[in-house]
Amino acid sequence: MTLNQIILSLILGLSLMTTIIKSVPMDPTIYIEGTIFDQWPEYNYNFEKTNPGSNVKTLGMVKAKLNSTTKVPELSSDDTKTSPNTLGTMQYPELFKYHFTSNVDAPASKNSGKNLPMKIQFKLDQDNSGFYTFFNQTFFPIDNMGYDVDPSFRIYKQSGNYHNFHFCVKMNSRFTYNGGEVFNFKGDDDLWVYIDDKLVVDVGGIHPAQDGSVNLDTLGLIKNKVYPLDLFYCERHTDGSTISIQTTIQAYCAWYDYCGVCGGTGAVCCNAKANCDDGDLCTIDSCPQPNLAFPDLQSVYKNCSHIPKDCPPANKCQVNSCDKTTGNCKPENLKCPDRSNECLKNTGCDDLTGCKYVSICTDSCDKKGNACVAGKCQQKTTSDCAAELDDNSCKVYSCNSTRGGCYSENKCKPDPTQICDVASCDDGACSIKTLPPDECNCGCKPNFCQKSNCVKNPSNNQFECSLLPADGIDDGNACTEDICDAVAQKITHVPYDTCKGCMSCNPSNGDCEAHNEVCNDFNACTENVCSPVKVGAGVGECVTTNTTCAPTTNVDKCKNYLCDSEKGCYETDVVCPDSGNCKVGHCDSKVGCSLKPRVCKSPAFCIVAECDETVGCIAFERRCASSNPKCKAGICVNGTTPEEGECESVNYDPKPFICQTGAIVSTAVIAGVTVAGAVALGIFIYGGKRGYDYWKESRSISMSSAVSSPMYVPSANASENPLYIPEGEL
């Protein structure tokens, strides 16, 4: 459960109470809270060092629009030679971001930007004129704290007295616009105030105390609407530090992190390197989300996150893993899977498509199409050979790789010792016919490669010898040359070598034909085709193209069209990344990824739900505007179904003097005014205008501020502070 949720439940419970409020006391005090960053000049040369001719109020140093994601100002230019950067002594623009963001883990070295964050609170008391004020002519809120816990850092002085002159303050608050509010500032050095992310007070640079103010009625704000108020203040140079704030803005904190810092990041009490290190170089250690609630700091540290380091491969032929000894991603070549059980042999890997293979079933008697069972190539059967050749029922088919593959023999054969027997076949049925002696005994003397054949001569009506090739010479395969050696009495069948590459001979007709299966690399992400190099040349080459998984029309831009080397094409949903915590990635099938504002829902009218870039959705009590801010307070009343809630205005109790109708100015008041006038006159006479100004600014003004950080403050009673981490051990 987040801290915000706990607070929300309490607020909601109170806000649902139906008690009618007729009057409320006026709040005499408001607090503006945030983070103060201790800056040591040796770590950031934007502090203490000055450019010739600077020492003046400098406008335009920062952009007029606050970065809505980081909630930290950005310089208008990174060029040190621009007038604002020169006059404002911004010698190292790249370090400006560390004026207002934590950089604890930077090395303790020159110009590293290292800083130390702590909690700070400004207490503003309401004076007699209705202004909430904070005034301090010697504003040194972190003396002996932060770096200066170590006495060796206490080297900067004012009139011989040590002070910490180098710090920056970041305060992110909210307020409900009533109308008529003003904000007045006087001090040194930098001060930038943003309202609704727009720069409204610009007092930049290293300089003596300077003024800046804004009347909120000039900003086009909407009454009763909640706006962010972001204040950024730096003290960058000796030997004075003055601050004066007068405002009628009733600023408040919407939420706190587990360190108790308003709108904090958790950096004040949790450092990932010091508090979350799990000793595993292959995990990314980080502190918990800052708006989570914990009973103590040890619980914070126990809930650190340790995310395994992501090491994505650079291509499909690489595996990338984290090296436990170095914490670096270590790429290695992919070991392609062993597919020998499929009769496949690996031939390498393609960066785009992955592992490639060839079939080992390439023998002329192996079945086509990589027929494989348990790693063994399947042989062609008589049926396979019959289909491959002429499929004649009067022939017997066999396969012999030495003979070039499939071949055939006549099914019906006569007894070679009976020269007058003639075999015949009819639809696979054999029959023997015995010829008359004069038709078969015609004086033939065949050799090994011949057989007797008697043919009747029409001229004399006698049978004469006409030898024929011996049975068995013709194997029925048009892709082999049939050779018979009568002397050696040997018949051979030599395959023709006319078809090359991925082309092979058709045994039924002897033509060279392209065979795509020869080119198959058994990668489902490629298309393999055998293409003739030249028409009629009998030579083919394999052409491989990568498979296109995306459709040619109506492409869904919210789908990733991917390919797996074994499974082929598949789809995954596009994950549109968020931008910060308040812009949610959204996908439209027509246009793809875009960003939408995160919607934070409120459970009741008197609860404001909105998105904060630091943590996401937050909820806080609605502060209502007043119809008469000087005399009445705005209060929120939740509605009951179906009525909505509303804001109302009720009288302050007791009523301010100005709100008392027909009030009589008493002698006590007159006496008070007279005494005050006498005091002022006396100060003016004996102290001069400077003394009078000091008295005028300081009367009825509290000079209170509070700073704390359990990590950077030593124990007050000289015992060991378990949360204090000495410099150099972070």
UniProtKB/Swiss-Prot annotation:
Glycosylation positions in this chain: 67, 136, 303, 400, 546, 638
Stretches that traverse the bilayer: 668-688
Domain called PA14: residue spans: 125-265
Record-linked InterPro entries: Fibro_Slime, PA14/GLEYA, PA14_dom, Prespore-cell_inducing_factor
Membrane topology: Single-pass type I membrane protein
Side of membrane Cytoplasmic, spans: 689-730
Superkingdom, taxonomy of origin: Eukaryota
Keywords per UniProt: Glycoprotein, Membrane, Signal, Transmembrane, Transmembrane helix
GO CC annotations on file: extracellular region; membrane
Ranges facing Extracellular side: 24-667
Tagged with keyword Signal: yes
SMART domains: PA14
Signal sequence annotation: 1-23
Family: Belongs to the prespore-cell-inducing factor family.
NCBIfam families for the chain: Fibro_Slime
Name of the molecule in the record: Protein psiL
Gene name linked to the record: psiL
